[in-house]
UniProtKB/Swiss-Prot annotation:
It holds the Pfam family tRNA_Me_trans_M. It is found in: Cytoplasm. The gene is mnmA. This is tRNA-specific 2-thiouridylase MnmA. It comes from Rhodospirillum rubrum (strain ATCC 11170 / ATH 1.1.1 / DSM 467 / LMG 4362 / NCIMB 8255 / S1). GO terms for biological process: tRNA wobble position uridine thiolation.
Amino acid sequence: MSQTPLSPPPVGGRVVVAMSGGVDSSVTAALLKEQGHDVVGLTMRLYDHGKPLGPGARTCCAGQDIHDARRVADRLGIAHYVLDYESRFREDVIEPFAASYGRGETPIPCVLCNQTVKFRDLLAAALDLGGTALATGHYVRRLDGPEGPRLYRAVDPGRDQSYFLFATTKGQLGRLLFPLGAMASKDETRAIARRLGLAVGDKPDSQDICFVPDGDYAKVVERLRPGVVEAGEIVDLDGTVLGHHPGLIHFTVGQRRGVGIGGSAEPLYVIALDTATHRLVVGPHAALARREIAVSGLNWLGEGEGPASAGTRARIKIRHASPPFPGQIFPGAAAGEARVVLDEPAHGVAPGQAAVFYGLDDNDARVLGGGWIGASR
């Protein structure tokens, strides 16, 4: 089915840019300014780490990043505002992150952040400022289809962030711009930053979870959920105790390295995290095989209101870095649920991660939606 890039807002119209202080959002603002738009920058203050973060910190929306965003805005000659979203970020992202670990899941806080404080709250703020659209530095594409805007993977597969935006609604897509989705590579983005004299042109990409700058997420979870990081037994599929672990939070389904069990005739993988007994269940790779996946929190971006009752063919990603698996998506037993049946078993299906659906046309580039992974078999 044909699709074309959506027409940009009228030249001179106001576009609000979510500026994190990194090169991607900075170039986004610069490109829109070059195109003649009335650009306004918004930066979210999400988390107070108790001390300013230096230039080497690889997070986003922290002290140094806010400073960098303001410098870029000054360079571009655009208005720039900082919004204090710390309380709502804690409520909508950090607390659910900790609760998810307490349930033995492997959460993705970036999806929650996009779903709530960015595309709900920040978009509302952009509209309040008279903006016609909110632009971000995400590497995804928004194209026009017969029924309205669609979400597509970025041109550069190595930079594609569509997995993290599966929860973006159809209504939100109509108000969002992603100018970097058509970039051939990150090098092209950095080259634009240097051409425009932006100080962040060589700034490293953010790597850490923004509210865990030192990488010690267990400490954050323990502070929010005292007692959740509890040591326990490592057992095989028959319940035989093989060793002990420092806390389930340190493990995810499918993990092999760092389990701490040696001397086995074959490699052992994390099969399940039993939060009731604090047991870490390990087994052979074959025990990870799953074909059916229960999905909750379904967001549907394909045609109609959801997957077809007879099943919708798609390719399904169960982790950001995993290849998509062919299969079918069926409606679930309740609203907001779906059932995924893969053609062949996948390994490492972890509760708390997302199952994101891609269409079979256009080189699997169109995002049909997604949801949160629950039980699998």
